[in-house]
Amino acid sequence: YYIQEPSAMAPASILPVEDGDVVLDICAAPGGKSTELAAKLHGTGFLISNDISNSRAKALLKNLELFGIGNMCVVSEAPNKLSTKFYQTFDKILIDAPCSGEGMFRKSQSMVTAWENNGVELFAGLQRGILNEVVKMLKPGGTMLYSTCTFSPEENEQSIEYLLSLDDTLELIEVPKYPGFCNGNPAWGKTENAELEKCARLWPHHIEGEGHFVALIHKKEAEQTQVFQSWIHRGCKPDKNAEEFFTHISADAGIKSAYIEENNGRLYYMAECMPDVSGLRMLRQGLFLGEIKKNRFE
């Protein structure tokens, strides 16, 4: 495991994930926020954790496996590829956006070096590219959370202004202001939209953590909501090897034999229902349990 920075715990705890939700963590590595989102699902719904970097996605997968999550899929794709596949699919989306990392300067010299080499303009552009695609994937009635670990208005208030300009059904909702949390600053936006006060800034001199920014955005319900994503439903009869394995598992573990699948001797615990991820760079669907070798389980 690794110890998550205190301020970095805020985004996943604030996003109001409910049982049965279909959730996307689009910039998920190394996985701390994804594990919190999965915990809030209580084994229901489905979580897609994505990171565009294949090497970072492997680290993400390792942490999700350690957490024992079965109702999940880890992919490594660009946002535009995901939006083509998952149009209006997700009830909740977490965007922990790549940023200049100003909030981490006192903790990490590497963040200072990255800022000197790239500046805020590069990251503001990356964020807008992600937001262009994420807005397409959120269901009407759904909620997304945008966060960064930087101070710059270009990557925070101004990125939220940009997001709101993409779709007139989007609206800011108030981020819970825990002790030490401050409002977003409308004066730092280009339009000075008073609604930006609903965002939250976490300043390191006010809290026992590093700098962070959090915004909650809701997409209003449409008159008619269509289901665009195709879903794969699991069958109810496990194969022979899975059946034998299940007989040795305590019922207290909460494992259902119908959700165990075998692939070349490897057993996986899968969700009852999951989105179709064909055509995507998928690292793992479900939880790897072990292998059947010479009539024994390893």
Protein language model features and the residues they cover:
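Glycine-rich nucleotide cofactor-binding entry segment
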Residues: 1-89, 121-126, 173-196, 202, ...
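Class I S-adenosylmethionine-dependent transferase superfamily signal
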Residues: 37, 127, 134, 141
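Helix-to-beta-strand junctions that scaffold the AdoMet/dcAdoMet cofactor pocket
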Residues: 41-42, 138-140
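Mobile active-site "lid"/loop adjacent to the S-adenosyl-L-methionine
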Residues: 55, 92-132, 149-156
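Conserved beta-strand signature within the Rossmann-like core of class I S-adenosyl-L-methionine
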Residues: 143-148
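Conserved Class I S-adenosyl-L-methionine
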Residues: 157-180
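Core SAM-dependent methyltransferase catalytic element
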Residues: 166, 198-227
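Polybasic, low-complexity RNA-engagement segments
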Residues: 210, 218-298
